[in-house]
Protein backbone atom coordinates (compact mmCIF):
# COMPACT_ATOMS: atom_id res chain seq x y z
CA UNK A 1 0.00 0.00 0.00
CA UNK A 2 1.47 3.32 -1.08
CA UNK A 3 0.07 6.81 -1.33
CA UNK A 4 1.13 9.28 -3.99
CA UNK A 5 2.51 12.52 -2.56
CA UNK A 6 1.88 15.70 -4.53
CA UNK A 7 3.11 18.40 -2.16
CA UNK A 8 4.40 21.56 -3.89
CA UNK A 9 8.11 22.17 -3.54
CA UNK A 10 9.04 18.58 -2.76
CA UNK A 11 10.15 15.91 -5.25
CA UNK A 12 7.35 13.65 -6.47
CA UNK A 13 7.64 10.14 -5.08
CA UNK A 14 5.67 7.25 -3.67
CA UNK A 15 5.34 7.73 0.06
CA UNK A 16 5.68 4.61 2.27
CA UNK A 17 2.82 4.06 4.68
CA UNK A 18 3.01 3.16 8.36
CA UNK A 19 1.24 -0.22 8.36
CA UNK A 20 3.06 -3.51 9.02
CA UNK A 21 2.76 -4.76 5.42
CA UNK A 22 4.34 -1.58 4.00
CA UNK A 23 7.13 -1.69 6.57
CA UNK A 24 7.79 -5.36 5.79
CA UNK A 25 8.01 -4.57 2.07
CA UNK A 26 10.39 -1.67 2.74
CA UNK A 27 12.53 -3.83 4.98
CA UNK A 28 12.79 -6.60 2.38
CA UNK A 29 13.61 -4.08 -0.34
CA UNK A 30 16.43 -2.58 1.73
CA UNK A 31 17.82 -6.04 2.45
CA UNK A 32 18.13 -6.48 -1.32
CA UNK A 33 19.01 -3.00 -2.59
CA UNK A 34 20.80 -1.38 0.37
CA UNK A 35 22.45 -4.36 2.09
CA UNK A 36 22.66 -6.59 -1.03
CA UNK A 37 22.11 -9.88 0.80
CA UNK A 38 19.70 -12.79 0.69
CA UNK A 39 17.58 -13.18 3.83
CA UNK A 40 19.00 -16.66 4.52
CA UNK A 41 22.58 -15.29 4.66
CA UNK A 42 21.79 -12.03 6.48
CA UNK A 43 23.26 -11.42 9.92
CA UNK A 44 21.40 -9.83 12.81
CA UNK A 45 23.20 -6.57 12.01
CA UNK A 46 22.01 -6.79 8.40
CA UNK A 47 18.43 -7.07 9.64
CA UNK A 48 18.98 -4.14 12.00
CA UNK A 49 20.31 -1.94 9.20
CA UNK A 50 17.48 -2.93 6.85
CA UNK A 51 14.92 -2.10 9.54
CA UNK A 52 16.72 1.17 10.34
CA UNK A 53 16.61 2.20 6.68
CA UNK A 54 12.91 1.34 6.49
CA UNK A 55 12.17 3.50 9.55
CA UNK A 56 14.45 6.24 8.27
CA UNK A 57 12.48 6.39 5.01
CA UNK A 58 9.44 7.36 7.06
CA UNK A 59 11.39 9.96 9.00
CA UNK A 60 12.97 11.65 6.00
CA UNK A 61 9.70 12.67 4.39
CA UNK A 62 8.56 14.51 7.54
CA UNK A 63 12.07 15.88 8.04
CA UNK A 64 12.06 17.49 4.59
CA UNK A 65 8.55 18.83 5.10
CA UNK A 66 9.60 20.34 8.44
CA UNK A 67 12.66 22.05 6.95
CA UNK A 68 10.61 23.36 4.03
CA UNK A 69 7.99 24.77 6.42
CA UNK A 70 10.67 26.67 8.37
CA UNK A 71 11.94 28.28 5.17
CA UNK A 72 8.46 29.00 3.87
CA UNK A 73 7.35 30.66 7.12
CA UNK A 74 10.75 32.28 7.76
CA UNK A 75 10.57 30.95 11.32
CA UNK A 76 12.81 32.16 14.10
CA UNK A 77 15.12 29.22 14.76
CA UNK A 78 16.71 28.02 17.98
CA UNK A 79 20.29 26.84 17.56
CA UNK A 80 21.41 24.63 20.46
CA UNK A 81 25.22 24.48 20.69
CA UNK A 82 26.55 21.67 22.87
CA UNK A 83 29.81 19.76 23.10
CA UNK A 84 27.75 16.68 24.03
CA UNK A 85 24.52 15.03 22.84
CA UNK A 86 23.85 11.81 24.73
CA UNK A 87 21.09 10.67 22.37
CA UNK A 88 21.28 6.96 23.18
CA UNK A 89 19.88 4.54 20.61
CA UNK A 90 17.88 6.00 17.75
CA UNK A 91 16.17 2.79 16.57
CA UNK A 92 13.70 2.42 19.44
CA UNK A 93 13.26 6.17 19.88
CA UNK A 94 12.33 6.67 16.23
CA UNK A 95 9.74 3.87 16.31
CA UNK A 96 8.24 5.29 19.51
CA UNK A 97 8.01 8.86 18.22
CA UNK A 98 6.52 7.73 14.90
CA UNK A 99 4.06 5.45 16.74
CA UNK A 100 5.08 2.42 14.66
CA UNK A 101 6.71 0.14 17.24
CA UNK A 102 4.03 -2.55 17.02
CA UNK A 103 3.94 -2.38 13.23
CA UNK A 104 7.72 -2.83 13.04
CA UNK A 105 7.53 -5.68 15.54
CA UNK A 106 4.91 -7.44 13.41
CA UNK A 107 6.86 -6.84 10.18
CA UNK A 108 10.04 -8.30 11.65
CA UNK A 109 8.15 -11.24 13.14
CA UNK A 110 6.74 -12.12 9.72
CA UNK A 111 10.32 -12.19 8.44
CA UNK A 112 11.41 -14.48 11.26
CA UNK A 113 13.15 -11.80 13.35
CA UNK A 114 12.70 -10.61 16.95
CA UNK A 115 12.54 -6.85 17.45
CA UNK A 116 14.30 -6.95 20.84
CA UNK A 117 17.23 -8.86 19.39
CA UNK A 118 17.42 -6.41 16.50
CA UNK A 119 17.26 -3.39 18.84
CA UNK A 120 20.12 -4.69 20.98
CA UNK A 121 22.48 -4.64 17.99
CA UNK A 122 22.59 -0.83 17.85
CA UNK A 123 25.54 0.93 19.47
CA UNK A 124 24.85 3.88 21.75
CA UNK A 125 25.96 7.01 19.91
CA UNK A 126 29.19 8.02 21.67
CA UNK A 127 28.43 11.73 21.54
CA UNK A 128 28.22 12.42 25.28
CA UNK A 129 28.91 10.92 28.67
CA UNK A 130 26.71 12.45 31.34
CA UNK A 131 24.05 14.87 32.44
CA UNK A 132 25.18 17.68 30.17
CA UNK A 133 24.81 15.53 27.05
CA UNK A 134 21.58 13.92 28.23
CA UNK A 135 20.06 17.34 28.89
CA UNK A 136 21.04 18.47 25.40
CA UNK A 137 19.46 15.38 23.82
CA UNK A 138 16.29 15.85 25.88
CA UNK A 139 16.07 19.48 24.78
CA UNK A 140 16.24 18.47 21.11
CA UNK A 141 13.61 15.77 21.63
CA UNK A 142 11.32 18.09 23.59
CA UNK A 143 11.58 20.97 21.14
CA UNK A 144 10.68 18.68 18.26
CA UNK A 145 7.73 17.36 20.27
CA UNK A 146 6.62 20.96 20.94
CA UNK A 147 6.96 21.80 17.22
CA UNK A 148 9.70 24.36 17.88
CA UNK A 149 12.12 25.12 15.02
CA UNK A 150 15.42 23.93 16.45
CA UNK A 151 18.82 22.79 15.19
CA UNK A 152 21.35 21.01 17.37
CA UNK A 153 25.03 21.63 16.65
CA UNK A 154 27.94 19.57 17.97
CA UNK A 155 30.87 17.33 17.03
CA UNK A 156 30.67 13.93 15.33
CA UNK A 157 33.12 12.11 17.58
CA UNK A 158 34.68 9.09 15.92
CA UNK A 159 35.41 7.31 19.19
CA UNK A 160 33.52 9.37 21.76
CA UNK A 161 34.35 8.29 25.28
CA UNK A 162 36.02 5.01 26.21
CA UNK A 163 34.86 1.63 27.46
CA UNK A 164 36.25 0.91 30.91
CA UNK A 165 37.36 -2.57 31.96
CA UNK A 166 39.29 -4.21 34.80
CA UNK A 167 42.38 -6.13 33.69
CA UNK A 168 44.78 -7.64 36.25
CA UNK A 169 43.09 -5.56 38.93
CA UNK A 170 43.68 -2.30 37.07
CA UNK A 171 41.19 -0.03 35.32
CA UNK A 172 41.96 0.23 31.61
CA UNK A 173 40.24 2.16 28.84
CA UNK A 174 39.41 0.94 25.35
CA UNK A 175 38.21 3.13 22.48
CA UNK A 176 34.45 3.15 21.89
CA UNK A 177 34.43 2.61 18.13
CA UNK A 178 30.70 3.16 17.75
CA UNK A 179 31.02 4.02 14.03
CA UNK A 180 32.74 0.72 13.16
CA UNK A 181 29.76 -0.41 11.05
CA UNK A 182 28.63 3.06 10.00
CA UNK A 183 25.56 4.92 11.21
CA UNK A 184 22.33 4.39 9.25
CA UNK A 185 20.68 7.44 10.85
CA UNK A 186 23.10 10.09 9.59
CA UNK A 187 23.39 11.81 6.22
CA UNK A 188 26.87 12.99 5.18
CA UNK A 189 26.83 16.46 3.64
CA UNK A 190 30.22 16.77 1.88
CA UNK A 191 29.02 19.92 0.14
CA UNK A 192 28.51 21.64 3.53
CA UNK A 193 32.13 22.44 4.30
CA UNK A 194 33.51 25.41 6.23
CA UNK A 195 37.11 26.50 6.91
CA UNK A 196 38.08 26.93 10.57
CA UNK A 197 41.14 29.12 11.17
CA UNK A 198 43.75 28.62 13.90
CA UNK A 199 47.03 30.30 14.95
CA UNK A 200 48.31 33.09 12.69
CA UNK A 201 48.43 36.80 13.44
CA UNK A 202 46.18 39.86 13.19
CA UNK A 203 46.94 42.82 10.91
CA UNK A 204 44.96 46.05 10.71
CA UNK A 205 44.05 47.92 7.55
CA UNK A 206 42.00 50.93 6.52
CA UNK A 207 38.68 50.17 4.85
CA UNK A 208 37.50 52.32 1.96
CA UNK A 209 35.14 54.14 4.36
CA UNK A 210 38.11 55.20 6.51
CA UNK A 211 37.46 52.82 9.39
CA UNK A 212 40.04 50.37 10.73
CA UNK A 213 39.41 46.69 10.07
CA UNK A 214 41.35 43.55 10.87
CA UNK A 215 42.64 40.59 8.90
CA UNK A 216 43.47 37.29 10.60
CA UNK A 217 46.29 35.99 8.38
CA UNK A 218 48.92 33.23 8.14
CA UNK A 219 46.48 30.78 9.72
CA UNK A 220 46.32 27.00 9.67
CA UNK A 221 42.95 25.96 8.28
CA UNK A 222 40.89 22.88 9.12
CA UNK A 223 37.73 21.99 7.24
CA UNK A 224 34.48 21.15 9.04
CA UNK A 225 32.17 18.76 7.19
CA UNK A 226 28.53 18.36 8.19
CA UNK A 227 26.65 15.17 9.07
CA UNK A 228 22.88 15.54 9.55
CA UNK A 229 20.66 13.37 11.74
CA UNK A 230 16.85 13.70 11.92
CA UNK A 231 15.39 14.30 15.40
CA UNK A 232 11.69 13.30 15.50
CA UNK A 233 9.29 14.73 18.03
CA UNK A 234 6.65 12.55 19.65
CA UNK A 235 3.91 11.88 17.13
CA UNK A 236 6.28 12.52 14.23
CA UNK A 237 4.69 15.80 13.14
CA UNK A 238 7.95 17.74 13.47
CA UNK A 239 11.37 16.28 12.64
CA UNK A 240 14.21 18.68 13.44
CA UNK A 241 17.88 18.44 12.56
CA UNK A 242 21.04 17.68 14.53
CA UNK A 243 24.10 18.76 12.56
CA UNK A 244 27.44 17.38 13.73
CA UNK A 245 30.84 18.43 12.41
CA UNK A 246 33.70 16.15 11.42
CA UNK A 247 37.22 17.55 11.03
CA UNK A 248 38.80 17.18 7.60
CA UNK A 249 42.25 18.29 6.58
CA UNK A 250 42.64 21.04 4.01
CA UNK A 251 45.78 19.15 2.88
CA UNK A 252 44.77 15.51 2.61
CA UNK A 253 47.86 13.97 1.07
CA UNK A 254 51.33 15.36 0.36
CA UNK A 255 52.52 13.54 -2.76
CA UNK A 256 55.94 15.20 -2.53
CA UNK A 257 56.70 13.55 0.82
CA UNK A 258 55.25 10.25 -0.40
CA UNK A 259 57.45 10.17 -3.50
CA UNK A 260 60.48 10.82 -1.29
CA UNK A 261 59.64 7.74 0.76
CA UNK A 262 58.47 9.75 3.79
CA UNK A 263 55.14 7.94 4.04
CA UNK A 264 54.34 9.04 7.60
CA UNK A 265 54.87 12.74 6.88
CA UNK A 266 52.76 12.42 3.71
CA UNK A 267 49.63 12.02 5.84
CA UNK A 268 50.80 13.82 9.00
CA UNK A 269 48.80 17.01 8.34
CA UNK A 270 45.66 15.01 7.59
CA UNK A 271 45.98 12.97 10.79
CA UNK A 272 46.71 16.00 12.97
CA UNK A 273 43.70 17.92 11.62
CA UNK A 274 41.29 15.03 11.95
CA UNK A 275 42.28 14.40 15.58
CA UNK A 276 39.91 17.25 16.48
CA UNK A 277 36.83 15.08 16.10
CA UNK A 278 38.30 11.78 17.30
CA UNK A 279 37.54 11.77 21.04
CA UNK A 280 35.17 13.52 23.44
CA UNK A 281 37.08 15.33 26.21
CA UNK A 282 40.71 14.50 25.42
CA UNK A 283 43.01 14.39 28.43
CA UNK A 284 43.89 17.98 29.32
CA UNK A 285 46.60 17.24 31.89
CA UNK A 286 49.22 18.36 29.35
CA UNK A 287 49.59 21.62 27.42
CA UNK A 288 48.91 19.77 24.16
CA UNK A 289 45.76 18.30 25.68
CA UNK A 290 44.53 21.73 26.77
CA UNK A 291 45.17 23.12 23.31
CA UNK A 292 43.29 20.22 21.68
CA UNK A 293 40.26 20.84 23.91
CA UNK A 294 40.13 24.54 23.03
CA UNK A 295 40.59 23.67 19.37
CA UNK A 296 37.64 21.27 19.59
CA UNK A 297 35.39 23.90 21.13
CA UNK A 298 36.32 26.59 18.65
CA UNK A 299 36.15 24.16 15.72
CA UNK A 300 32.49 23.25 16.14
CA UNK A 301 31.43 26.73 17.22
CA UNK A 302 33.05 28.45 14.23
CA UNK A 303 31.57 25.97 11.74
CA UNK A 304 28.13 26.26 13.35
CA UNK A 305 28.11 30.06 13.32
CA UNK A 306 29.25 30.18 9.70
CA UNK A 307 26.40 27.80 8.86
CA UNK A 308 23.86 29.84 10.83
CA UNK A 309 24.86 33.11 9.14
CA UNK A 310 24.85 31.44 5.71
CA UNK A 311 21.30 30.22 6.31
CA UNK A 312 20.20 33.64 7.56
CA UNK A 313 21.72 35.55 4.63
CA UNK A 314 19.98 33.30 2.08
CA UNK A 315 16.69 34.98 2.98
CA UNK A 316 17.66 38.35 4.50
CA UNK A 317 19.61 41.24 3.04
CA UNK A 318 19.86 43.23 6.28
CA UNK A 319 21.47 42.22 9.57
CA UNK A 320 18.83 44.11 11.56
CA UNK A 321 16.55 41.08 11.83
CA UNK A 322 19.23 38.67 13.07
CA UNK A 323 18.03 38.58 16.73
CA UNK A 324 14.44 38.21 15.49
CA UNK A 325 15.30 35.14 13.40
CA UNK A 326 18.19 33.53 15.30
CA UNK A 327 18.38 32.42 18.96
CA UNK A 328 21.65 30.69 19.89
CA UNK A 329 21.68 28.69 23.13
CA UNK A 330 25.05 27.93 24.76
CA UNK A 331 24.96 24.68 26.73
CA UNK A 332 27.49 25.42 29.50
CA UNK A 333 30.75 27.29 28.90
CA UNK A 334 32.16 25.01 26.17
CA UNK A 335 30.63 26.92 23.23
CA UNK A 336 30.95 30.40 24.81
CA UNK A 337 33.87 31.24 22.51
CA UNK A 338 31.04 31.67 20.00
CA UNK A 339 30.43 35.17 21.38
CA UNK A 340 33.85 36.36 20.23
CA UNK A 341 33.51 34.35 17.00
CA UNK A 342 30.19 35.96 16.03
CA UNK A 343 31.70 39.39 16.72
CA UNK A 344 34.66 38.47 14.50
CA UNK A 345 32.44 37.26 11.66
CA UNK A 346 30.20 40.33 11.79
CA UNK A 347 33.08 42.81 11.99
CA UNK A 348 35.90 41.23 9.98
CA UNK A 349 33.91 39.33 7.34
CA UNK A 350 30.78 41.46 7.01
CA UNK A 351 32.35 44.81 8.04
CA UNK A 352 29.85 45.85 10.70
CA UNK A 353 31.02 48.47 13.23
CA UNK A 354 31.62 47.35 16.82
CA UNK A 355 28.48 48.91 18.29
CA UNK A 356 26.16 47.28 15.76
CA UNK A 357 27.91 43.90 15.95
CA UNK A 358 27.73 43.93 19.75
CA UNK A 359 24.05 44.90 19.74
CA UNK A 360 23.24 41.95 17.46
CA UNK A 361 25.47 39.51 19.36
CA UNK A 362 24.15 40.38 22.82
CA UNK A 363 20.55 39.93 21.62
CA UNK A 364 21.25 36.59 19.92
CA UNK A 365 22.98 34.44 22.58
CA UNK A 366 21.50 32.78 25.67
CA UNK A 367 23.51 30.77 28.18
CA UNK A 368 22.80 27.90 30.56
CA UNK A 369 25.13 27.40 33.53
CA UNK A 370 25.04 23.96 35.17
CA UNK A 371 27.15 24.42 38.29
CA UNK A 372 28.67 27.10 40.52
CA UNK A 373 31.67 25.02 41.59
CA UNK A 374 34.80 27.05 40.77
CA UNK A 375 36.65 24.02 39.39
CA UNK A 376 33.86 23.44 36.87
CA UNK A 377 33.73 27.03 35.59
CA UNK A 378 35.98 26.87 32.56
CA UNK A 379 38.96 29.21 32.24
CA UNK A 380 41.72 29.36 29.63
CA UNK A 381 45.25 30.83 29.85
CA UNK A 382 45.60 34.12 28.01
CA UNK A 383 48.86 32.78 26.55
CA UNK A 384 46.96 29.91 24.89
CA UNK A 385 44.54 32.35 23.25
CA UNK A 386 47.44 34.55 22.10
CA UNK A 387 48.87 31.60 20.19
CA UNK A 388 45.72 29.80 19.03
CA UNK A 389 43.03 32.49 18.65
CA UNK A 390 44.76 35.90 18.57
CA UNK A 391 41.85 37.79 17.00
CA UNK A 392 39.41 36.46 19.57
CA UNK A 393 41.68 37.57 22.39
CA UNK A 394 41.60 41.12 21.01
CA UNK A 395 37.80 41.01 20.89
CA UNK A 396 37.52 39.61 24.43
CA UNK A 397 39.83 42.35 25.71
CA UNK A 398 37.59 44.98 24.13
CA UNK A 399 34.40 43.38 25.49
CA UNK A 400 35.96 43.34 28.96
CA UNK A 401 37.16 46.95 28.68
CA UNK A 402 33.70 48.23 27.76
CA UNK A 403 32.00 46.07 30.38
CA UNK A 404 34.28 47.21 33.22
CA UNK A 405 33.81 50.80 32.13
CA UNK A 406 30.06 50.36 32.67
CA UNK A 407 30.63 48.66 36.04
CA UNK A 408 32.89 51.53 37.12
CA UNK A 409 30.23 54.03 36.09
CA UNK A 410 27.58 52.37 38.26
CA UNK A 411 29.90 51.43 41.16
CA UNK A 412 32.64 54.06 41.25
CA UNK A 413 35.64 53.36 43.45
CA UNK A 414 34.93 49.65 44.02
CA UNK A 415 38.14 48.12 42.67
CA UNK A 416 37.43 44.74 44.29
CA UNK A 417 34.15 44.52 42.39
CA UNK A 418 35.99 45.23 39.14
CA UNK A 419 38.46 42.46 39.90
CA UNK A 420 35.71 39.94 40.64
CA UNK A 421 33.57 40.83 37.63
CA UNK A 422 36.37 41.09 35.08
CA UNK A 423 36.37 38.52 32.27
CA UNK A 424 40.15 38.36 32.68
CA UNK A 425 41.31 36.85 35.97
CA UNK A 426 44.76 37.88 37.20
CA UNK A 427 44.90 35.94 40.47
CA UNK A 428 48.46 35.07 41.43
CA UNK A 429 49.80 36.61 38.24
CA UNK A 430 48.21 33.84 36.14
CA UNK A 431 46.09 35.66 33.56
CA UNK A 432 43.12 33.55 32.48
CA UNK A 433 39.91 34.11 30.52
CA UNK A 434 36.79 33.26 32.52
CA UNK A 435 34.40 31.83 29.96
CA UNK A 436 31.34 31.89 32.23
CA UNK A 437 31.90 35.63 32.78
CA UNK A 438 32.10 36.14 29.01
CA UNK A 439 28.86 34.23 28.45
CA UNK A 440 26.99 36.14 31.16
CA UNK A 441 28.18 39.54 29.92
CA UNK A 442 27.00 38.81 26.37
CA UNK A 443 23.90 36.65 26.91
CA UNK A 444 20.29 37.74 26.72
CA UNK A 445 17.61 36.33 29.08
CA UNK A 446 16.01 33.03 28.09
CA UNK A 447 12.73 34.86 27.54
CA UNK A 448 14.09 35.53 24.04
CA UNK A 449 13.00 31.96 23.24
CA UNK A 450 9.35 32.91 23.64
CA UNK A 451 9.20 34.38 20.16
CA UNK A 452 9.99 30.90 18.77
CA UNK A 453 6.89 29.36 20.38
CA UNK A 454 3.90 29.16 18.02
CA UNK A 455 0.63 30.69 19.13
What are these regions (language model features)?
Residues 2-455:
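A conserved ligand/cofactor-binding region detector
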Amino acid sequence: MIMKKKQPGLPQYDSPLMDADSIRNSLSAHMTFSISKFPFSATTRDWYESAAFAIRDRLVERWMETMQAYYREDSKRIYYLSLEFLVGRTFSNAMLNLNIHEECKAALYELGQDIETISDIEFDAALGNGGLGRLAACFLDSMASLNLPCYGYGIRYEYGMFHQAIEDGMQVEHPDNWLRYGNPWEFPRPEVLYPVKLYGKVVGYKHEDGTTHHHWVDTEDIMAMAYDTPVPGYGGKTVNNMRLWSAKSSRDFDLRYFNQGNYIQAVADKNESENLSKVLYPDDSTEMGKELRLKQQYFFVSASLQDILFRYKKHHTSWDELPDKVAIQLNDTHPSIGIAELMRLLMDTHHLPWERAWSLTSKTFSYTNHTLMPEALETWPVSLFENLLPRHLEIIYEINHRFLRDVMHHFPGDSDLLRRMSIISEDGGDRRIRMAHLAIVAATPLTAWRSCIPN
